[in-house]
Amino acid sequence: MQVKNTEELRRELIELLSEMDVVQRGKFILSSGRESDYYVDIKRAVTEPAVLDVIARLIADAAGEVDRIAGPALGAVPIATAVSLYSRKPLLMIRKEKKGYGTSKLIEGDLQKGDRVAVVEDVTTTGGSLLKAVRAIQENGGIVEKAFVIVDREEGAVDEFKREGITLIPLLSVSDFNHS
């Protein structure tokens, strides 16, 4: 089996996502509340094993020395699961808010104080949703130095993370799809 380098994997991911028409044109409301003339519909793509395989390899190779892989619900959970399986690092799932029943946990999984955590997300615009997950990890004793996103919309998330002292690493940016 041929080992692919990072650039080959990136090209493969662009091709897979382009074939699935993940960038849709029209009028959309984003999770940030903003209007947009395009939408990055990655949810369907991350249900495909071939897509998850490429994503997991790219993130696991770039994550370096971490103790846990985390993903905010719902969109990032399949991504975090794939990276966890590929890297053999335990998984954390971050809820949007605490449950009002059962254990009332915000974080599912075994997060220990001082654990180094790589956080993954499907799409970022401003980075607000992902930063909320990062803060939940930090408030529970985890250390986040790197976060990964499959597609960055290039609307400020990378800079916002930089201000927080965290490196946000987009696997792809929306400009990678502008030819479509």
From Swiss-Prot:
GO terms for molecular function: magnesium ion binding; orotate phosphoribosyltransferase activity. 5-phospho-alpha-D-ribose 1-diphosphate binds at residues 95-96, 99, 121-129. Orotate binds at residues 125, 153. It is an enzyme of class 2 (transferase). Its cofactor is Mg(2+). GO terms for biological process: 'de novo' UMP biosynthetic process; pyrimidine nucleobase biosynthetic process. It catalyses: orotidine 5'-phosphate + diphosphate = orotate + 5-phospho-alpha-D-ribose 1-diphosphate. It holds the Pfam family Pribosyltran. InterPro entries: OPRT (IPR023031), Or_phspho_trans_dom (IPR004467), PRibTrfase_dom (IPR000836), PRTase-like (IPR029057). Its EC number is 2.4.2.10. Keywords: Glycosyltransferase, Magnesium, Pyrimidine biosynthesis, Transferase. Pathway: Pyrimidine metabolism; UMP biosynthesis via de novo pathway; UMP from orotate: step 1/2. Belongs to the purine/pyrimidine phosphoribosyltransferase family. PyrE subfamily. Homodimer. Catalyzes the transfer of a ribosyl phosphate group from 5-phosphoribose 1-diphosphate to orotate, leading to the formation of orotidine monophosphate (OMP). This is Orotate phosphoribosyltransferase. The gene is pyrE.
